[in-house]
Regions:
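Negatively charged, low-complexity tracts enriched in Asp/Glu with abundant Ser/Thr
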Residues: 2-46, 80-91
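C-terminal low-complexity, charged extensions that often adopt amphipathic alpha-helices
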Residues: 2-7, 88-110
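Long beta-sheet-rich domains in secretory-pathway and surface-associated proteins
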Residues: 23-24, 69-71, 108-109
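Signal for well-folded cores of large energy- and translation-related assemblies
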Residues: 30-33, 60, 101-105
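Ser/Thr- (and often Asn-) enriched beta-sheet segments in non-cytosolic proteins
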Residues: 39-43, 58, 70
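Soluble, non-transmembrane alpha-helical interaction regions
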Residues: 47-49, 60
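A short, glycine/Asx- and small/polar-enriched loop/turn
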Residues: 49-55
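Intrinsically disordered, low-complexity regulatory segments enriched in Ser/Thr/Pro
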Residues: 60-91
């Protein structure tokens, strides 16, 4: 019974339109990046070539940005309800945020 409830819960968050998933991804990235520093913002790039297929995101702290992170729409839409996938993505985002902070600290030390 519990497994069935968990699967139903996961399906509730899976899928969605490109824009719905984009909104979820932006909120997820911001939520985890801001755990490292509330000044960090997640920015999703608008690119017609990626529209409907991919998302491109960076973390920004002032004038500094993280390397580009790309996400396939289908993967995010299907897996955003999976705890293990979300945990791995959160770890990746927080690591990018820490690297961005380390670069910011080094730049201010100069």
């Amino acid at each position: 019974m519990l497994c069935r409830a968990l699967l139903q819960f996961a399906r509730m968050f899976s899928s969605g339109s490109y824009d719905d998933v984009k909104r979820w991804l932006r909120m997820f990235l911001n939520s985890h990046a801001k755990r490292e520093d509330p000044r960090i913002e997640a920015v999703l790039e608008d690119d017609e070539a990626r529209e409907g297929r991919f998302y491109a995101a960076r973390l920004r702290l002032g004038s500094q940005t993280s390397p580009l992170m790309e996400f396939e729409y289908d993967v995010v839409a299907q897996r955003r309800g999976e705890l293990a996938w979300c945990a791995a993505l959160a770890q990746r985002v927080r690591e990018q945020a820490r690297q961005l902070l380390a670069g910011s600290t080094a730049a201010h030390a100069r």
